[in-house]
Amino acid sequence: AYTGPKVLNLSDEGYPIQPYGVQDNPYSILDIADIVFINPVNTGFSRVLPDEDGKMPSRDKQKENFFGVNADIKYLAEWMNTFTSRKNRWQSPKYLIGESYGTTRVSGLALELQNNQWMYLNGVILVSPTDIG
């Protein structure tokens, strides 16, 4: 079930019910867990931001810092360390979930967090790690 606080009004068959709208999600886990969704740069709504001087980094600098499995793992680990510190969540359980191409990153991210950020995870979930099509 979806983890958010609200869900669409749907029939048992999955069709919208009139009047259209949302209802409380009885399966939401937000009363017992924090969920943070992280997208690597240029996926979802994640984008490269201008430098402190207001200029966009060069394409070469962007490739070096963001585009590639190893680059993604490095900056995501640094971001997670910063987020965990700022939100005072070091004592909270931490799980990573990666789907499709994200499984490669999550696998490496778990190791990077442990080796370079001193962050030990409670678990890792890999969804559809390969395409057998």
Segments the model singles out, each with a brief description of its role:
Residues 1-62:
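N-terminal cap/lid subdomain of alpha/beta-hydrolase-fold enzymes
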Residues 21, 28-33, 40, 64-86:
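Alpha/beta-hydrolase active-site loop
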Residues 33-36, 92-96, 120-125:
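Beta-sheet entry/capping signal
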Residues 40, 122-133:
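Active-site nucleophile loop of the alpha/beta-hydrolase fold
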Residues 60-78, 112, 117-118, 129-133:
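Substrate-gating cap/lid region and adjacent catalytic-acid/histidine neighborhood
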Residues 86-91, 113-122:
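Secondary-structure transition/capping motifs at alpha-helix termini
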Residues 87-101:
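Alpha/beta-hydrolase fold nucleophile elbow
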Residues 103-115, 124:
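Short glycine-enriched nucleophile-adjacent loop
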